[in-house]
Structures are given as C-alpha cells and as structure tokens.
C-alpha cells in the first residue's frame, strides 16, 4: 500500500480547520500528522469536537515552524487574514507545499492587499510565487504550485457564475452586478455581535456595502478573464442559516439575440471538465440545500430578453467548496490525483 501524504492544519480549531479535519479523515491518500491551534495547545482535538473523537486522537499543538516542517509534507493554513504570510516563507523553505485559506496570497499586487486588509508585508518574492487556487479557472497552474492562495466563498461563487461570460466576451463588463447571500458561519467562529442567534435569526441584512474586502479579489480575476479592467458592484448579505451561499449575478448582454438555451450550452461547454460544477437545465435554479456539505457548486441561469440581461445564479456550501473542500481539491491537483478525491459530491436532503 502506498505511503500516505502527511498533512498538517494550522488553525485547526476554527470552522475552516474542523471542516478540513472532517474531510481529510475520509480522504484515502492522506494522514493528518499535525493540528496547530495556539489557543487550544495541549487540548485533545476530540475534546474540542467530541463528534470526531472516535476518528482522531491527536492533540492540538502550538504553532511552531520546525515542528510543522518535521511532521508534514503539506500544510493548510486556516488562519485569520494577516497570519499566513508570517508562516508561509519558512514552511516553503522547509520544503512543504502550502495551501492558504486566508486572503494573504490571493493578490497579484501586495499593495492592493495592504490597502484593503492593512498591515505590513515583507514577503513580496514569496507572494509572487503564489497561484490563485480556483481549480476551474487555474487548474494547470495549480498542478505545479508550491503555494496556493485559496479563494473564499464569495469570490468562488461569484467567479464561477461570471467566468464564462467574461472569458467569452458575452457581456458589457461595466454592467456586472453581484448580489450575494451567506450563512453566518462565513463570519467564522470568533464571537461577533452580528453572528449571535438573537441578532441573525429571522433577519436578512446587507453589510460592507460598496466596501467589502472581497471586491478587489473578484475584480482581479474578472479582469484577468476579460483581458481588461473590470469593476463590479458587489453587495453581500447575511442570512439566518448556519451554512450555504447563493449568488445572483446580473449583466448586460452584448448580443441581445442570445437566449437562455444558447447560454446554457456555453456554460455546459465551459464547465465540461469541471467535476465540482453542475450546470442545471433550463428553468432550474440552484438552492443552497442541494450543496450543503458538498464540494459542488450548482449554477442556473436565465436570459431576460425584455431587459437584454443575463441572470446567473450559483449556490455552494461556504465551508466546503467555498473554503476547505476547495483547498483539498487544489491539493489533489498538486499530487496528480483525481481532483474530487475524498470530497463529497452529494448533499444532505431534506
């Protein structure tokens, strides 16, 4: 039997970290060799998450570079923004492959990162090596990458909805409007007033209107796809459910003669080799429940011939395809494995 790949998770006690643990425990080719969580160092992981205690007996450890390099070949950094860039250079120097789930290595230009996220960066050479970790768009680059900046849930759902339109030049890029709705787990596990049950239940609210930090990330990739500078109108909303994301995208068509069947044919061809994307048939629109617990993004669309606009909808699990599952999908590519290996494709229903 082939030796299993030894992987580590830094930030193992958060929502992203525990999703990585859950998914990797069912991955046939890996072994979890290290769990890093400074605030819970010395605590058995099974005490933090008793539902997993029968599957993993590892103790959370302090985050120490030498220990990670000694224990692992691959490491996932499921840390808040601003931490990964202090760890990645040393991990790469130690010969590890690094998958960063934060925003630290998603940007081509570090000045853009600093203007939206703040903080000082002294890792420009390392950042230039990073590959944007959306497999459906950058699969071949990811295969050979040592450092992957994995996109989050809003960019993933938005970009998968927009990519065929921009790549094929089907829309006026200046008309791109993205309305996004996320479950409260997208805010992470740290205590925040807006995530409290009494605040979030039975309420839908927009936030960070015209200034959400994922805007420049979405625009960076949209511009790359379109071959020109693209600006988007992006508005996120918090909805009263634990997990799930629904994006509704609107754009003006360049060819008003296109109909929904034409657009579906274009999307099906674009994602034909993308096992994590399901393009739905005519008149079928995605629901967040379909994607719950899976690494699948569902896409539906309609052409409004009256307004000459296309409406594209995408639904995914913000903690799986929007975070941890996507990182594992990228890891699979770097190892030459089938990219959905170990990843769930069928959700819970009802």
From Swiss-Prot:
Primary localization: cytoplasm
Record GO cellular component, one term: cytoplasm
Enzyme class of the recorded protein, top EC level: oxidoreductase
Any one biological process term the GO annotation gives: L-arginine biosynthetic process
Annotated compartments: Cytoplasm
Keyword terms of this UniProt record: Amino-acid biosynthesis, Arginine biosynthesis, Cytoplasm, NADP, Oxidoreductase
Pfam families given in the database record: Semialdhyde_dh, Semialdhyde_dhC_1
Biological role stated in the UniProt entry: Catalyzes the NADPH-dependent reduction of N-acetyl-5-glutamyl phosphate to yield N-acetyl-L-glutamate 5-semialdehyde.
Name the UniProt record assigns to this protein: N-acetyl-gamma-glutamyl-phosphate reductase
Source organism of the structure: Gloeobacter violaceus (strain ATCC 29082 / PCC 7421)
Name of the gene encoding the protein in the UniProt record: argC
